[in-house]
Design a protein with these regions (language model features):
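Structured beta-strand/loop patches that form or line metal/cofactor-binding pockets in enzymes
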Residues: 36-78
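Intrinsic disorder at enzyme termini
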Residues: 2-9, 18, 146-167, 184
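Extended low-complexity intrinsically disordered regions
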Residues: 5-49
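Flexible, glycine/charged-enriched surface loops at secondary-structure junctions
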Residues: 42-44, 110, 131, 153-159
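Compact, charge-rich alpha-helical regulatory domains located at protein termini
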Residues: 163-169, 173-191
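Stable alpha-helical structural segments in soluble proteins, enriched in small hydrophobic residues
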Residues: 101, 138-153
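Active-site- and interface-proximal helix/loop "cap" or "latch" segments in soluble metabolic
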Residues: 60-62, 70-137, 190
Length: 191
């Protein structure tokens, strides 16, 4: 489903470009996770109970995300996942959804969570506009950074996975690094 359309007179999406040439829509699920984010770390909440932290992005680039995980060492299940972000509504919604996905039904194991892809997050949200795909990539990267941090802290260095680019769109052959670089260079769409 396309979430971008040419603006028609009298029809307005959730967001419209300054020139009025394009607008895009967010699903009700995206709106719910933006307006009512799940597992958001409020204020200066104590983070000592967490045994893993992940960070990605930079405020200078417009998006920064930090996640905290509490992993049960006996089962390696993610039993708690909290987060803070400096970013747009799509980044907030994507991270909120990811936090639900990794903790629901008793939590994913670290190996299961590492297999989570940006597409999985976007599917659960009901889609994102093309110009917002990178937001699901950000939360995916922060999650994987936290998993590596857990392995560092628990001296399981052989389980740390060096991050390489990951294929986001197999048809267009677009990787997460392609999207990040394009956004940093000012791109607004993948086209």
């Amino acid at each position: 489903m396309s979430h971008v359309q040419k603006a028609n007179p009298g029809t307005q999406g959730d967001v419209t470009t300054k020139d009025g040439g394009q607008s895009w829509f967010y699903t009700d699920t995206v709106k719910d996770h933006f307006f009512n984010p799940k597992n958001f770390l409020k204020g200066e909440e104590d983070t000592a109970r967490f045994n893993a932290v992940g960070k990605v992005g930079s405020p200078a680039c417009g998006d920064e995300l930090r996640v905290w995980m509490r992993v049960d060492p006996a089962t390696e299940r993610i039993v708690e996942f909290r987060w803070k972000t400096f970013g747009c509504g799509s980044a907030i919604a994507s991270t909120s959804m990811a936090s639900v996905m990794v903790t629901e039904n008793g939590g994913l194991t670290l190996d299961e969570a590492r297999k989570l892809k940006p597409q999985d997050i976007m599917e659960r949200l009901g889609g994102l506009p093309q110009r917002k795909f990178h937001c699901s990539v950000l939360c995916d990267k922060a999650l994987r950074d936290a998993i590596n941090d857990y392995f560092r802290r628990s001296n399981q260095f052989d389980r740390i996975v060096a991050e390489a680019s990951r294929l986001v769109d197999p048809v267009a052959k677009v990787t997460d690094k392609d999207i990040e670089e394009a956004v940093l260079e000012g791109a607004h769409t993948i086209e």
